[in-house]
């Protein structure tokens, strides 16, 4: 585990990391459990946040409270030498291996320090004993890279699917973490975690003045104009707010159209920092032209703003109207991965078809992106090339 950064005050309260009461896991399943697990895909929710924000506290809360949910939790960073880790991880011959334990509230728990995917593969052997998987990342991890693994897995017919990304932000130190400038000019870890989140939990709100929480909330909203922001104390949250989000599948299209209508454009909280931009273009899009637009942004990275800075897209989401398709199509993107999927929602005959996109990233220019979308989707490839040049590829 990487050492904690900052003062002792930024670390988790040791009392909050007391080991939950454990019972040995049974190796056999009842007939009902086996039936309930057959054919059903299991949602994976990624829990991320800066060091000391409250990730372990949230997971301990889920593992100990009576909530009638059967949740499997994978602890990827549980604090060096903590009582929780000692109970969940067994060292033998100098190698750490996983030990799944069943808690009295029906949850499963495991500590793993290398590969969360391997832990999930082992966990799936117990399919039928749980309904959801929560995966904790390390404090400095890029949740986009973790999310991409499960998104790709789902495309390969896996038994799991990515449900959403939850980012926890410390009320006391969050603003400091989000405004920290890295010497190499890269996006700092805390900001990237917020930018990728579907749900942002502002934690420990009881430890700071209300005015500080408002400032932090404003900064978070300036980074991510799409995610839902919730305020919590000691990471206590209604599980319905963090589970069954369907943030990465077609079911989210049912509610996405209404949400996209209220997404505000944001201004950067630091020069060249992350912002949310949104635009709408009426009409139908040709699927191959839409792919060209997205691939130039995410893959080729050859789209620049007015200051000649490369536009870097971290998260992309939207609803589009594809020519000759009656269903609304949801477009999702994380880093260099993206997907188009038909939703259960049909376009009504008496309503105008439209395309509405939300992009979260750095150096984004709404006007240029909207013009490029119109040119790419509705005009010829020759006209598109007037907006970028091959020798301007960003590095």
Swiss-Prot record:
A motif (CXCC motif) lies at residues 107-110. It is an enzyme of class 3 (hydrolase). Residues 8-20 have a biased composition (Acidic residues). Its EC number is 3.6.5.-. This is Zinc-regulated GTPase metalloprotein activator 1C. It comes from the Eukaryota. Keywords: Chaperone, GTP-binding, Hydrolase, Metal-binding, Nucleotide-binding, Nucleus, Zinc. Zinc chaperone that directly transfers zinc cofactor to target metalloproteins, thereby activating them. Catalyzes zinc insertion into the active site of methionine aminopeptidase METAP1, which function to cleave the initiator methionine from polypeptides during or after protein translation. Mechanistically, the N-terminal psi-PxLVp motif binds to the C6H2-type zinc finger of inactive form of METAP1. Residues 1-22 are annotated as: Disordered. A motif (psi-PxLVp motif) lies at residues 17-24. It catalyses: GTP + H2O = GDP + phosphate + H(+). GTP binds at residues 49-56, 110-114, 203-206. GO terms for cellular component: cytoplasm; nucleus. InterPro entries: CobW-likC_sf, CobW-like_C, CobW/HypB/UreG_nucleotide-bd, P-loop_NTPase, Zinc-reg_GTPase_activator. SMART domains: CobW_C. Disulfide bonds: none annotated. The gene is ZNG1C. PANTHER family: COBW-RELATED (PTHR13748), ZINC-REGULATED GTPASE METALLOPROTEIN ACTIVATOR 1A-RELATED (PTHR13748:SF31). The keyword Ribosomal protein does not apply.
């Amino acid at each position: 585990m990487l050492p904690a950064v900052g003062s002792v005050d930024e670390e988790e309260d040791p009392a909050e990391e007391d080991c939950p009461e454990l019972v040995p896991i049974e190796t056999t399943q009842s007939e009902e459990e086996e039936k309930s697990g057959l054919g059903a895909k299991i949602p994976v929710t990624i829990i991320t946040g800066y060091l000391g924000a409250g990730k372990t506290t949230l997971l301990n809360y889920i593992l100990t409270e009576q909530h009638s949910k059967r949740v499997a939790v994978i602890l990827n960073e549980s604090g060096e030498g903590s009582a929780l880790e000692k109970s969940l991880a067994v060292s033998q011959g100098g190698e750490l291996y996983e030990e799944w334990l069943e808690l009295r509230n029906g949850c499963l728990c495991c500590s793993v320090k290398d590969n969360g995917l391997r832990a999930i593969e082992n966990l799936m052997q117990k399919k039928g004993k749980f309904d959801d998987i929560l995966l904790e990342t390390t404090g400095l991890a890029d949740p986009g890279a973790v999310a991409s693994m499960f998104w790709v897995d789902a495309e390969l017919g896996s038994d799991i699917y990515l449900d959403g990304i939850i980012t926890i932000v410390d009320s006391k130190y969050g603003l400091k973490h989000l405004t920290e400038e890295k010497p190499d000019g890269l996006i700092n870890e805390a900001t990237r975690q917020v930018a990728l989140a579907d749900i942002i939990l502002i934690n420990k709100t009881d430890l700071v003045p209300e005015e500080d929480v408002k400032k932090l909330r404003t900064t978070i909203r300036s980074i991510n104009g799409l995610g839902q922001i919730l305020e919590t104390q000691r990471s206590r949250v209604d599980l319905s707010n963090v589970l069954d989000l369907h943030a990465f599948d077609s079911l989210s299209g049912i509610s996405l159209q209404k949400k996209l209508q209220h997404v505000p454009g944001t201004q950067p909280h630091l020069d060249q920092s992350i912002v949310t931009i949104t635009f709408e273009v009426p009409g139908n899009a040709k699927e191959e032209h839409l792919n060209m637009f997205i691939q130039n942004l995410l893959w080729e990275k050859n789209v620049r703003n007015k200051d000649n800075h490369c536009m870097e897209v971290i998260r992309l989401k939207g609803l589009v109207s594809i020519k000759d398709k009656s269903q609304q199509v949801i477009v999702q993107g994380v880093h260099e991965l993206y997907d188009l999927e038909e939703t259960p929602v049909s376009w009504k005959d008496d309503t105008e078809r439209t395309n509405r996109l939300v992009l979260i990233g750095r150096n984004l220019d709404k006007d240029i992106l909207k013009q490029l979308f119109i040119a790419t989707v509705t005009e010829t490839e020759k006209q598109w090339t007037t907006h970028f040049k091959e020798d301007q590829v960003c590095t």
